[in-house]
Amino acid sequence: MRRSFALVLVAALAFAAAGCGGSSKKSSEGTTSTSCDKGDLNLVNAGELTVGTDNPAYPPWFGGKEKAPWKVSDPRSGEGFESAVAYAVADKLGFAKSEVKWIVVPFNTSFAPGPKKFDFDVNEISFTPARAKVVDFSDSYYNVNQAIVVKKGTKIANAKSVAELKPYKLGVQIGTTSYQYIKDNIKPSKQPAVYDTNDAAVAALKNGQTDALVVDLPTAFYVTAAQVPNSKILGQFPTSASGEHFGLVFQKGNSLVR
């Protein structure tokens, strides 16, 4: 994980440098660094960087103790994968931690068409061609697979292939690539149970309303460790040749990303 984290920061910082407008200076060691004039950046609120994410804010993407208005974790802590990425980008753009403002943006709202209240959103949002028609994405900061979570001791827990998943009721959050994977690849005989939030989908599995939950792999680890007792990751699904990856989301045409 440490090597992956280093790579993600490199990708995030490379994106940030692109938004700086090219101002640079040479150090005594002969290396060139990029600096930003915050006044030249196209920001929602002058003088501060506004970052959106959903609430609750879950590990491993966010850390720190719960603090209002945030539930479970606190994006402002700088702890957790996505919080650290956001602050690394902010630092490269010339913002101190105190100049970063976090706002609550529901998952499906983040990549919907129209004006945005954030400069960028970080919330495990996978790049898809359809989404890229209405919002802009940064380069990948995390490559991901989809996974399936089941309760131990259930019939579906013995499944060993995608074909064996077809008879079961699968739960998933609406608007996600997890939902798209179910439709395009698993193609179950029963309509999947679709929920507005991942919390609701998790609760359905926990309460026995669904047989399994499809989510991205890091989320699956959190679900099995902290949310659904006596559950396990049944397996992870292979991705397409191009793979699935998360990117920072921007309003379409935002000059911060190009």
Predicted regions and their residues:
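Sec-dependent bacterial lipoprotein signal peptides
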Residues: M1-A18
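Bacterial lipoprotein signal-peptidase II cleavage site
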Residues: A17-T31
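Extracytoplasmic small-molecule ligand-binding "clamshell" domains
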Residues: T31-D121
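Extended ligand-binding regions for polar small-molecule ligands
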Residues: V85-Y87, K92, T154, K169, ...
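Hydrophobic residues within well-ordered alpha-helices
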Residues: V89, P113-P115, L165, A204-K206, ...
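Acidic, polar ligand-binding/catalytic clefts
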Residues: S98-E164
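A ligand-binding cleft/hinge motif common to bilobed small-molecule-binding domains
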Residues: T109, I125-V134, K183-D184, K206, ...
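Periplasmic-binding protein-like
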Residues: Y142-V150, P218, A225-R258
